[in-house]
Amino acid sequence: MSFEWPWQYNFPPFFTLQPNVDTRQKQLAAWCSLVLSYCRHRKLYTLDVLEAQESPVFNNKKIERKLSVEAIQVVFEELRKKGNLEWLDKNKSRCLIMWRRPEEWGKLIYQWVSKNGMVNSVFTLYELANGDDTEKEEFHGLEDWMLLRSLQALQTDGKAEIITMDDGKGVKFF
């Protein structure tokens, strides 16, 4: 299944941050939406600012336009403000991208657990993210850091408890 680009992606001015405040706000909202949709489609969880400039999301070779590194940082800062991005280093060169926040992943996981009658069951983190039973679920293949944060959100809500097992971490659902 190929990614469907929004109409703005083929509009050259989209690749230059606009000076008008209202226009810029709409433009940044469109960029944020595009980045999250693209990362979701490709199941990307980490991004590098310099590498991002060469990726298709910020570099439209068809119209020969690419977003500057400075503009990418503005888009990333907007994503951070919305809770969809977290910097991995002080230089702000690498980041975690959360196209779905931990609470949202937790809700999806808990719905699956409930739907399949597995409340009061214990799972390893591997079973949840990579097991045969979850193969058709959206959270299948979820990176460990995001899975753990999702389960921590469920633990805060009293729906799960993260436990330490001999071979790593596990979780019990309530």
Curated annotation (Swiss-Prot):
The family database entries (Gene3D superfamilies) matched by this protein are listed as: Winged helix' DNA-binding domain. Chain C. Domain 1, Winged helix-like DNA-binding domain superfamily/Winged helix DNA-binding domain
Against Pfam families, the record matches this protein to: ESCRT-II
Could you list this entry's UniProt keywords, alphabetically sorted: Cytoplasm, Protein transport, Transport
- Give start-end of the signal peptide: none
Cellular component (GO) terms are: ESCRT II complex
Top-rank taxon: Eukaryota
Chief subcellular site? cytoplasm
Please list the GO terms describing molecular function.
Answer: protein homodimerization activity; structural molecule activity
Subcellular localization is given as:
Cytoplasm
Q: PANTHER family given for it?
A: VACUOLAR PROTEIN SORTING-ASSOCIATED PROTEIN VPS25 (PTHR13149), VACUOLAR PROTEIN-SORTING-ASSOCIATED PROTEIN 25 (PTHR13149:SF0)
Q: What does this protein do?
A: Component of the ESCRT-II complex (endosomal sorting complex required for transport II), which is required for multivesicular body (MVB) formation and sorting of endosomal cargo proteins into MVBs. The MVB pathway mediates delivery of transmembrane proteins into the lumen of the lysosome for degradation. The ESCRT-II complex is probably involved in the recruitment of the ESCRT-III complex.
Q: Its quaternary structure?
A: Component of the endosomal sorting complex required for transport II (ESCRT-II), composed of SNF8, VPS36 and 2 copies of VPS25.
Q: What is this protein called?
A: Vacuolar protein-sorting-associated protein 25
Tell me what organism the protein belongs to: Danio rerio (Zebrafish)
Give the gene name. Answer: vps25
